[in-house]
């Protein structure tokens, strides 16, 4: 993910100007990285080091989603629908 793509994702999911830390932004950025790494692993099946990183990112995203679910279920449902994630 390059700098421009990252800024686009932040701008799309930010709750206010300069927002980079809200759960929605973090989840969207992790989803982009997870999708990119998943494509990489389809080609490089024996890259176990990257696979571990992928599993850690998925766990981190799951934790953020659980937090958002507990705090504000409407925001949770919106980000799930927008990113096309399944629960």
Swiss-Prot record:
Task: Identify a single GO molecular function assigned to this protein.
Answer: structural constituent of ribosome
Query: Which Gene Ontology cellular component terms are annotated?
Result: cytosolic small ribosomal subunit
List, alphabetically, the Pfam families matched. Answer: Ribosomal_S15
What UniProt keywords are attached to this protein's entry? Ribonucleoprotein, Ribosomal protein, RNA-binding, rRNA-binding
Classify the source by domain of life.
Bacteria
Task: State if Ribonucleoprotein is listed as a keyword.
Answer: yes
Alphabetized PANTHER family for the sequence: RIBOSOMAL PROTEIN S15, BACTERIAL AND ORGANELLAR, SMALL RIBOSOMAL SUBUNIT PROTEIN US15M
Protein name per UniProt: Small ribosomal subunit protein uS15
Source organism per entry reads Clostridium perfringens (strain 13 / Type A)
